């Protein structure tokens, strides 16, 4: 499974990807993505292979630790390591080919944008479940 940013400068491949993703509806993810929710999945660090443009990746880290990596040319969010883990967050919107991913869960559903309808598929969570439960849900 391959992906790249809007300008094509940053490219990556995900090996043995999950078949499911999550959508986060928190205000940080809305601001980071510019959309009503942020669709993504999580993989082990060794499953992500950078193919091009790693030198174009810039990071913004809030004092709370929230991190957003992005292409310094086009601004697209790009994969970034999850703090204190051996996992990487991968934004699903960067994927190149049709991948058939389904939504396993919605996070921070109580914080969803007022214009966004309540999702009808996937588990609904008011906050983030334990990390092990998120991983389990993405692999189910």
Segments (PLM) and residue ranges:
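A short Gly-Trp-Pro
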Residues: 1-140
């Amino acid at each position: 499974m391959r992906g790249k940013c809007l300008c094509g400068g940053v490219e990556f491949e995900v090996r043995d990807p999950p078949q499911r993703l999550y959508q986060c509806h928190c205000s940080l993810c809305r601001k980071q993505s510019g959309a009503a929710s942020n669709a993504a999945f999580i993989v082990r660090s060794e499953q992500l292979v950078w193919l091009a443009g790693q030198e174009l990746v810039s990071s913004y880290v809030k004092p709370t630790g929230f991190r957003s990596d992005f292409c310094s040319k086009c601004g697209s969010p790009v994969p970034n390591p999850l703090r204190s883990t051996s996992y990487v967050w991968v934004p699903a919107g960067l994927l190149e080919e049709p991948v058939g991913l389904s939504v396993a869960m919605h996070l921070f559903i109580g914080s969803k944008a007022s214009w966004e309808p309540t999702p009808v598929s996937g588990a609904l969570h008011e906050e983030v479940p334990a990390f092990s439960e998120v991983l389990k849900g993405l692999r189910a």
